[in-house]
Amino acid sequence: LFRRMTVAQLAEQGDYRFFYATNRVPGGDASSLATRFGSEREADLKFGVFDTEIRPSLGLGMLIDPTEWFQNEEIRLKEVRSLEQQAFIEQLRGLVESSPHRGLLVVVHGFRERYPSALRKTAFLGHVLDINAPVLVFDWPGNQGSSLSGYRRAREVAHASGSELADTLHLVIREVQPDRLWLIANSMGGQVVADAVHELYREADLADAPVEIEHVVLTAPDVDKDEFNQQFKKEITALARHLTVYVSSNDRALLVSRLINRGTRRGESTLSPD
């Protein structure tokens, strides 16, 4: 199980190291993972690593029903440690250089994700993909509540967080310098990516140079379809070699989003699930 993923493996059997960058405002109690970061956004990026223990029983069922109990039981966060930016760069670069393709996977989660669950789901995704490269999660404060007003606040935060994701990608491209950079985003995380790409596209040295990102994958992106077609597709072509979009015909979050935003979302499928 997970035979390819050796770069991030630690000495202890079943333990793996992942990286994070977040634009959350630090919470009042750094000793507790649940309160280490809050649900507010700020422009300053914080960096770190987190070590996880993955139970051998972990299966694809978590994608279907990723309950808090299941995450806590099957994916245990053993240590979460903050790093200064330079130490973060050096550690991440070291793993990139030791990976077979000098690759790096960047993950952006979606609406309602809290800091601890974002870390656990990142570990889960890395193991399911079984990718032999380091994995970095860009964690943004999408947990603004389950109400309609909470959704609207989350969209505002997603748009604003594009700036910090752009800063993170810029740091990765310039300082870590992976040969292959992959970017995966889910749901409203797709909006964060769209806004980050818009910022990076305006940098001539990035937009006019050879592509910096190998592959961008968006799953059920909560992005306006017209915005996607008229702006994002053009801009991403200048930055990424490949783009894959997975759509859904029965994603309830996208259906609610369409009602709130009064427009079709790019992650919606026109095909009936029946």
What positions do the PLM features span?
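Active-site micro-motifs of SAM-dependent methyltransferase domains
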Residues: 113, 190, 223
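Short N-terminal helix/helix-N-cap motif within the alpha/beta-hydrolase-1
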Residues: 115-117
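The conserved beta1-alpha1 loop
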Residues: 106-110, 220
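Lipolytic serine-hydrolase domain surface
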Residues: 2-83, 89-99, 119, 123, ...
